[in-house]
Amino acid sequence: MLLNSFGDLRNHRYHGLFGAIIIEPPAAQYYSNFFNRKESFSEQAVITAPGVKSFREFVLFAHNGIRLLDKDGNLIKTSEQGEDTGHGGVDHEDTGEKGFNYRSERFFNRLRRVPIVNRIFSSRTHGDPATPLLKAYTGERVIIRYLMPGDKPRNISFVLHGHNWLAQPDDPFSRRISVQGAVSAGGVYNIELENGASEYPGDYLYRSGSLKWDVESGMWGIFRVMKKGIGYCCTCVCRTFGNWWERQWFEKYE
C-alpha cells in the first residue's frame, strides 16, 4: 500500500514524502536479509508465518523526475549531458533524475571513470551499483513489492532479466511476463517470481524498460542469486525452531 502526502502534491512527493505499508500474513515474523535477527522494517527481509511458505521480500520505490544534486551542490541534468542538439531539445517529461529507493547509478559517472561502454554494468570494473542490491538463494520464493510514488506522468516499465511472473497474480492461467508495463505515478505491484529465484547463481539485471533517459540516468540495479550452502541450511533451521518455540509459548499462555 503506497503512502502519499496530499497536502502539497507538487512538492511533497517530489522531495521524498512517501512510504509504504506492507501487509503480511497473520503472525508473520520478519528476519534480517541474511541473519537470524528480527527487524521491523527494511527494504529486504525474510518473512515467515504459520501455514505459509517463507519468502524473501524486496521493496522497490521507482523514482522518475527527482531532483538530485552532485557533491558540489549543482543540479544534475543527465538528459542534457552529452545530448546531440541536432536531434531537437529534450522533452520536458524526460527531465529530472531516476533511480530506486532514492539511489541512482548514472552511466555518466561510470563512463567518466572507465570510458568503456561494454563494461557499463560490470561490477568487476565499477563495483556494485548504489541502487539496492537484491540478494536471494537459488530456488527461493521471492516477492517484489514494486511501487511508483512519482513524479512524472510518463509511464515506465519494470524489467527483471532471467525471471518471469504471472501478469495477474491471482489467476494461475494468466500469461507469464518478464516486463511489467504501464507503470505510472501511484502504481503498486506485487510480483512473485515463478519458481522463485533462478536455479542458476549469478547477477541478473533489473531496470526500467527504457534504456534512454531511464537506465542511463541510473534506473537499474542487480538481483544477485547465490548458491545454497551450509550457512543457508543453518539459518533455515534456526528460523524454523524459533517460530515453533514462539508458537508453543503463545498457545500455552494465550
Residue map of PLM features:
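Copper-binding active sites and cupredoxin-like electron-transfer domains
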Residues: M1-E254
